[in-house]
Amino acid sequence: MGFLTFLIVPLLILGISGIVYIYREVVRLMSRSALKNKVVVITDAISGLGKECSRVFHSAGARLVLCGKTWEKLEALHDALISVADPSVTFTPKLVLLDISDINNMEAMGKEIQDCYGCVDVLINNASMKMKGPLQSVSLELDKKIMDANYFGPITLVKAILPHMISRRTGQIVLVNTIQGKIGVPFRAAYAASKHAIQGFFDCLRAEVEEFDVSVSTVSPTFIRSYHVQPQPGNWEASIWKFFFRKLSYGAHPVEVAEEVLSTVSRKKQEVFMANPIPRAAVYIRTFLPELFFAVVATGVKEKHFVEEEK
């Protein structure tokens, strides 16, 4: 009996693994087929995540409108996409020069985006401005700049695109946010505030447009790592406090997040957290045991000051 168990258990594990793999591949292929011919707008397409989103949606057969504030980088992305794509199953992306923080020009930009294909099926809000530092050292001017880039700009674009989705009774609006839209991290006050604001806006938006068959989704990783930058051992960025909010050792890779965005769009998921159990637990602890959460946060801040004083 023991020998049979020794043989059966590995085979059972292997069989289950095979079934899971096949299921994931089927879901992935269905996700891509569901996006063929869809008009997908990606803001800040020239960022690391923007490029990966452009790649996966382009290969899925979507009609892309790529937005960014540097024309040369948009053209380079355009050339990179068409150089590796099969022209018989993909569409040539259209480009729109867009600075998401330029609120006064957003209505005109929304019209230009609409005019690319006559409609928008999916709007992916990917643009974001990051900042860290003690809150008392951040000027009000910089606070406003961050709010323009992370909140006022994106919602102004949403308001420009939304009426057309409502009139067609179809569409999906996606926000690539961060877990800092749910919990605040010290020394990122302005950034966390902007992310809380945009999260609240999307939560309200979801309820208000459901009757018009417009879907609203948020994808929130702990943070998205760059391709090249990694924290140096021993510094504050690599400390136990960073571990508390990470997805992987150095955050979620743009490729991983882009695939999740693709899955979220095709399956119309409402909210996705890309996080390991520790930051997931932090969100719930903040809600149900706030005193404990605040104590842990304060301990992390004290640890930082202690390390700096020792240096």
Swiss-Prot record:
GO terms for cellular component: extracellular region. NAD(+) binds at residues 41-65. GO terms for molecular function: oxidoreductase activity. The active site is at Y191. It comes from the Eukaryota. It is found in: Secreted. Pfam families: adh_short. Residues 1-18 form the signal peptide. Keywords: NAD, NADP, Oxidoreductase, Secreted, Signal. Its EC number is 1.1.-.-. Its main location: secreted. Substrate binds at T178. Putative oxidoreductase. Belongs to the short-chain dehydrogenases/reductases (SDR) family. This is Dehydrogenase/reductase SDR family member 7C.
